[in-house]
Structure formats: structure tokens, C-alpha cells
């Protein structure tokens, strides 16, 4: 069987097993599957505000096109960070494009070489990836097992970061 025949057979099998997926519109549905927890991606007021701001600034760009450091910083993001810092009584704030990236950034940059990151066995991948990218030691503890967590904390040296 050549590759084309094999792919066709695989697709036919998926159709028979009801595992064949077809992309479609998802309008008028409640979204339980995306990272849009606050529903901002479809918020009409926000969309109108973005359109208004786009016209007001006469912008010719959709999105940053790159990292903020090199090519993608916007004054509106800096204004948001200033506002968030003020609201939370802090010197500064940093906005990330997703919770995944925020967790990755925190766990890869704040813990240092002599520190330990302990995380629940079933923690999200972004925490594990952030820990892996850091210079800190890192290990998991059994899911929801406070005794295992406590034992590992007592054996630790340096600062201990716990993620649950």
C-alpha cells in the first residue's frame, strides 16, 4: 500500500469510527475549550474599542510582528502595565500574552541555581517547562500529597518555590 492509499484508508477508518473531524463555525456556542476565559475575544465592546483605537492612531500594523524588546512594543501596553501597577500598589507590572507564557517566564527566571521548584505531579506543562528552563533544581511531588510535599521541603536547601 503506498502512502496515498494508506492515508485514504486511515481517513476512511476515522469516518467509520466517528473520529473524523470537520472544522466548522462555532458562533452562538458557549466556549469551554479555549483560553479565552473572560470571553474577550468575542466581546463586542472590546472589538469596537479596538477598531476605534486602530482608526484613531492611524495604525498600519495588526499585532506586534515580533517580541516587544525588538520590534513589537506599543504605548497602549505600557499604559495598561502602568494602570495595573497603580491598581495593585506596585512599582511596575508586566503583561504577558497568555497564562502559559507568564508561568513559563516566572519559573524560568526567578528561581536561581541554589533554589528548588516543587510542583504537583499533575501541574500544567508550562510550569514544568519553566522549571526545566531555569537553573534551579526541580522535582515533582505526588498529586495532592501534602506529606510528600512537606518531606521534600524539609530536605531542601535554598529558597523553595511550590506550584500547585
Name what the model sees in each region.
Residues 2-62:
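N-terminal "arm"/small-domain region of PLP-dependent enzymes with the aminotransferase-like
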Residues 55-98:
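Conserved N-terminal alpha-helix of the aminotransferase class I/II PLP-enzyme fold
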Residues 62-63, 94-97, 119-120, 140, ...:
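General beta-strand structural signal in soluble alpha/beta enzymes
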Residues 95, 100-106, 126-127:
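Short glycine/serine/threonine-rich phosphate/pyrophosphate-binding segments
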Residues 106-125:
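Conserved PLP-anchoring active-site segment centered on the Schiff-base-forming lysine
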Residues 113, 134-135:
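Short, structured coil segments at secondary-structure junctions
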Residues 139, 143-164:
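Active-site phosphate-binding strand-loop segment of PLP-dependent enzymes
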Amino acid at each position: 500500500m503506498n502512502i496515498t492509499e494508506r492515508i485514504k484508508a486511515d481517513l476512511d477508518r476515522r469516518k467509520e469510527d466517528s473520529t473524523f473531524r470537520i472544522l466548522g463555525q462555532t458562533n452562538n456556542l458557549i466556549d469551554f475549550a479555549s483560553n479565552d476565559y473572560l470571553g474577550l475575544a468575542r466581546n463586542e465592546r472590546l472589538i469596537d474599542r479596538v477598531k476605534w483605537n486602530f482608526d484613531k492612531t492611524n495604525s498600519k500594523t495588526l499585532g506586534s510582528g515580533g517580541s516587544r524588546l525588538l520590534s513589537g512594543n506599543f504605548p497602549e501596553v505600557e499604559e495598561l502595565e502602568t494602570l495595573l501597577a497603580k491598581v495593585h500598589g506596585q512599582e511596575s507590572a508586566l503583561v504577558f500574552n497568555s497564562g502559559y507564557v507568564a508561568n513559563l517566564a516566572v519559573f524560568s527566571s526567578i528561581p536561581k541555581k541554589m533554589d528548588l521548584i516543587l510542583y504537583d505531579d499533575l501541574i500544567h506543562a508550562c510550569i514544568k517547562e519553566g522549571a526545566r528552563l531555569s537553573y534551579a533544581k526541580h522535582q515533582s511531588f505526588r498529586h495532592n500529597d501534602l506529606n510528600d510535599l512537606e518531606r521534600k521541603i524539609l530536605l531542601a536547601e535554598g529558597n523553595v518555590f511550590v506550584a500547585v
